[in-house]
Design a protein with these regions (language model features):
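Feature activates predominantly on carbohydrate-active enzymes
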Residues: 1-170, 200, 273, 278, ...
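Single conserved hydrophobic/aromatic residue that forms the stacking wall/gate
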Residues: 301-311
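Well-ordered, non-membrane alpha-helical segments in soluble/globular domains
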Residues: 70, 74, 106-109, 148-153, ...
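Polar, glycine-rich mid-to-C-terminal structural blocks
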Residues: 204-287
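Conserved protein kinase catalytic core
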Residues: 132-134, 178, 311
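Acidic-and-aromatic substrate-binding clefts and catalytic sites of carbohydrate-active enzymes
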Residues: 95-107, 177-180, 186, 213-220, ...
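Short acidic, glycine/serine/threonine-rich loops at helix termini
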Residues: 54-56, 101, 134-140, 181-185, ...
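Active-site neighborhood of glycoside hydrolase catalytic domains
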Residues: 147-239
Length: 311
């Protein structure tokens, strides 16, 4: 078993174990694999009071309110994720509490990251746009304000000092009433690029969610296209637009987001919902795999040559 990194070798060990379980581990077993996607990340909608938004299986696995982190459980989690090739975890809810960025919580996140690192898993955090205002009394969240930009640079430096391989931020902004760059007459690109500049020295990325809608929109299913298509090519290289598979909200059956195939010069990542918000909560057992497969295999016919959405 060999690979280009310790994580790759770990994936190889799990591949051999799978072959053994399936009765395929014979002497001519020869598997060569390379991940198609660079980032394979779980977003946890865990809150700092240990509740979990749309969580139907108990309280937060990170146990934010406990004195010590649940190290044994986090080791099990890391092994579970690595066994299926996942390499990143966003620890907190996209509807973020600004306190995730205070000194106490950064130290706790660093303890978690120290364990996840053993399994090739990079740690990320969700942030609230108004954090500079809430935590340090800044008067504005304008992404073109030098004071705001410097605040985020300082915060990225502080986090990276505690977590050298910190992955970056996941951002929900100007959606469902939450603040964002549009509150200051700026664009999603202005906001994302400010954060991208802050994490770039440490190799970080910004995952900017395209789940944006407001009651005033005349066509909610197309609002992401209306807000992002004109910004194609304006985002920094380390910004990825995170797009839900459906244009409304993870509905069991709905068309796929019209934003796929509309961004030719901007990296995209697809967001699926594993928790059963629309599929029976904790009352039913539903297999999601075929839904994901259907979405990834769809051909985008409006492009010059039919292209799988996965591409």
């Amino acid at each position: 078993i060999d690979g280009g990194s310790q994580a790759a070798i770990r994936y190889g060990v799990y591949a051999l174990q799978r072959a053994e379980v399936l009765g395929k581990a014979n002497t001519d077993l020869d598997i060569h694999e390379k991940p198609y996607y660079e980032y394979r990340i779980l977003n946890h909608w865990d809150n700092l009071d240990d509740t979990v938004e749309r969580g139907y299986a108990g309280l937060s696995m990170w146990e934010w309110t406990a004195k010590e982190i649940p190290a044994k459980r986090i080791h099990h989690y890391g092994e579970l994720c690595a066994s299926v090739g996942l390499n990143g975890a966003v620890l907190n809810n996209v509807n973020a509490n600004p306190l995730i960025l205070d000194k106490e919580h950064i130290e706790r996140v660093a303890q978690i990251a120290n364990i996840l690192r053993e399994y090739g898993i990079t740690t990320y955090l969700s942030i609230k746009w108004t954090s500079p205002i809430t935590l340090d009394g800044l008067k504005s969240g304008d992404p073109l304000d030098p004071k705001v930009r410097q605040w985020w640079k300082n915060k990225a430096s502080e986090i990276s000092a505690a977590i050298p391989d910190f992955g970056g931020f996941l951002v929900k902004a100007n959606s469902e009433g939450q603040a964002g760059p549009q509150d200051y007459g700026r664009t999603h690109a202005d906001g994302a690029n400010m954060l991208a500049e802050a994490v770039a020295p440490y190799g970080g990325i910004i995952m900017w969610r395209a789940f944006v809608y407001s009651p005033s929109s005349s066509d909610r299913a197309n609002q992401a296209v209306e807000e992002f298509k004109s910004l194609d090519g304006q985002f920094a290289d380390n910004v990825i637009i995170q797009i839900k598979n459906g244009p409304i909200d993870f509905q069991p059956r709905e068309p796929f987001s019209p934003l796929f195939g509309q961004l030719y010069n901007t990296p995209m990542m697809m967001e699926f919902q594993i928790t059963q918000e629309y599929l029976g909560f904790s009352n039913h057992l539903v297999y999601h795999g075929t839904t994901y497969e259907e979405c990834l295999d769809l051909s985008l016919m409006h492009i010059s040559e039919p292209t799988r959405q996965a591409e």
